[in-house]
Curated annotation (Swiss-Prot):
GO terms for biological process: establishment of mitotic spindle localization; meiotic cell cycle; mitotic chromosome condensation; mitotic cytokinesis. It is found in: Cytoplasm; Nucleus; Cytoplasm, Cytoskeleton, Spindle. This is Nucleolar and spindle-associated protein 1-B. Its main location: cytoplasm. It holds the Pfam family NUSAP. Residues 121-134, 467-485 have a biased composition (Basic and acidic residues). The gene is nusap1-b. Residues 44-206, 250-294, 338-496 are annotated as: Disordered. InterPro entries: NuSAP. It comes from Xenopus laevis. Residues 261-281, 447-459 have a biased composition (Low complexity). Microtubule-associated protein with the capacity to bundle and stabilize microtubules. May associate with chromosomes and promote the organization of meiotic or mitotic spindle microtubules around them. Keywords: Cell cycle, Cell division, Cytoplasm, Cytoskeleton, DNA-binding, Meiosis, Microtubule, Mitosis, Nucleus.
Length: 496
């Protein structure tokens, strides 16, 4: 059998290649590219001697590239060899760079990824050199096109080298990759590590910023002084304005008079026969000077005039006000005790007088007292006592109650007690009329209660149980009480 040429081998179909391999005694159950390579080695062993260190992938890539170039030249190719698409290696856009040039350009860049790229480019250079050796028996027009493609690839290589140099210069600024993982290196920096703050220092800094209590109190006092001073100034201005208004309204001689009247209100002066200084004109009292806002606190402002002038004559019976114990008529009024304030009165003399009437009689003169009618307790002033128009304008100062028994000249004298005179006077209470209750019933039966208590004291740990006899006695008593009540209701007698 004649050995086919290389071009004939490449133009055969896969089935024909298998038949050829079987006839040659080779393994036919292989892929197309490997089967073609095995046939070439079998029929042309010198091609193997020329490239002893060539890998199996070189011939495959050569055939792929040749077929691709033939397809570009002739859309309808003569070869009937079926090729597996997508399995072959695609040529890289950035072609190979010599290792020495790259190392010289990127000096100081010792990254593992760059070294692996250099190894890959070296392998590709080896493949290209082998492709050139294999493609010697191809036609001249193919060689021409190949040379053109190589020229374009060289231009591309020069461009890529420039780009790589630029990238290498940029990479040199980036630190070299070490064995530390990606994010662990950042944690080793002192600034980036989140550390717990020193709270003691923080608290001290805040405490220094704080204000001391003494300074705070000083500042508070200053603020209060400023506010109070402004208020005092306003008060002083209002007082001055009020004084100026009063000075404009009243003459200078009248301004000094109210001072005396104010003093007389506090402590009354002794009486004189002339115009008493304790009396002040009514018009003066009603002036703006004596308004409620300007009155002294010490003066009794209320118009209260005490009816009781002695503490011994105070009424302490509250049943009249509360209307309690109305059925006890005898207890509402009790005989008044004998007081030193009452005068001794004979049977033919006047009836009893109150303390107020006695006081008023003392104020009157002796000849006026003689002219008074006998049976009138109230005082009617005589024409000699009537006040003049100038005295009527003057008002009496209010009486100050000192809670002391007032002493008059007549009450100081102790008179002898007259029994007939006191009996002749009417009673000041309602006496009891009717039969009195027997004395024994009102008394409490203390003996029974005492005996009962003594029994309880003696037997406090053993309580007395009610026996059958005691219960029978109690039942008999209850029946007797019911019988008596029924009889009383039948006869119309109320039974308690």
């Amino acid at each position: 059998m004649d050995a086919p040429t290389l071009s004939e081998l490449e133009g055969l179909r896969y089935s024909e290649l298998q038949k050829l391999a079987k006839t040659a005694g080779l393994k036919a159950n292989l892929k197309a590219d490997k089967l073609l390579k095995a046939l070439k080695v079998h029929f042309y062993p010198e091609s193997k001697d020329e490239s002893p260190d060539s890998d199996g992938c070189t011939s495959l890539t050569d055939t792929d590239e040749l077929n691709s170039s033939q397809e570009k030249e002739e859309p309808v190719s003569v070869s009937f060899v079926t090729h597996r698409r997508g399995r072959g290696r695609k040529p890289l856009q950035n072609q190979a760079i010599p290792k020495d040039e790259f190392l010289s350009d990127s000096a100081g860049v010792g990254s593992e990824s760059l070294a692996s790229e250099i190894d890959n480019t070296q392998d590709k250079d080896c493949l290209e050199s082998k492709k050139k050796e294999v493609s010697l028996p191809i036609l001249d027009n193919k060689h021409k096109k190949r040379s053109r493609s190589q020229d374009t690839s060289k231009q591309n290589n020069s461009e890529t080298t420039e780009k790589r140099q630029k990238k290498a210069s940029n990479v040199s600024s980036i630190p070299s990759a070490g064995k530390i993982p990606r994010y662990v290196g950042r944690l080793s920096k002192p600034g980036s590590k989140p550390s717990t703050p020193n709270f003691k220092k923080l608290h001290e800094a805040h405490f220094k910023k704080m204000e001391s209590i003494d300074k705070f109190m000083e500042r508070k006092q200053k603020r209060l002084d400023a506010v109070s001073s402004s208020i005092q100034e306003v008060k002083m201005l209002t007082k001055k304005s009020n004084l100026l208004k009063l000075v404009e309204k009243t003459p200078v001689s009248d301004i000094k008079k109210p001072v005396k009247s104010r003093l007389s209100l506090l402590s009354p002066l002794p009486r004189t026969t002339g115009a008493s200084p304790s009396r002040t004109p009514m018009s003066r009292r009603r002036s703006g000077r004596f308004s409620t806002a300007n009155k002294s606190i010490l003066v009794d402002r209320s118009g209260f005039k005490p009816s009781v002038l002695s503490s011994s004559k105070m009424n302490v019976r509250f049943s009249e006000a509360t209307k309690d114990n109305e059925y006890k008529r005898s207890l509402i009024k009790t005989p008044a005790r004998k007081s030193s304030s009452f005068l001794p009165i004979t049977p033919k003399s006047e009836p009893r007088q109150t303390l107020s009437s006695i006081k008023k009689t003392d104020l009157l003169t002796s000849p006026e007292k003689a002219k008074k009618p006998d049976h009138n307790t109230t005082i009617q002033p005589s024409p000699a006592i009537t006040e003049s128009p100038c005295q009527q304008n003057k008002a009496n100062t209010p009486f100050k109650f000192m809670a002391q028994n007032t002493e008059t000249p007549n009450t100081n004298k102790k008179g002898s007690f007259d029994l007939q005179a006191s009996l002749s006077r009417p009673l000041g209470y309602q006496p009891h009329r009717g039969k009195l209750k027997p004395w024994g019933e009102s008394k409490e039966n203390k003996s029974g209660s005492n005996s009962n208590v003594s029994v309880l004291k003696n037997n406090f740990k053993q309580p007395q149980l009610q026996t059958r006899e005691e219960r029978r006695k109690q039942h008999e008593l209850d029946r007797k009480g019911k019988r008596d009540q029924a009889l009383g209701t039948r006869r119309g007698v109320p039974v308690k």
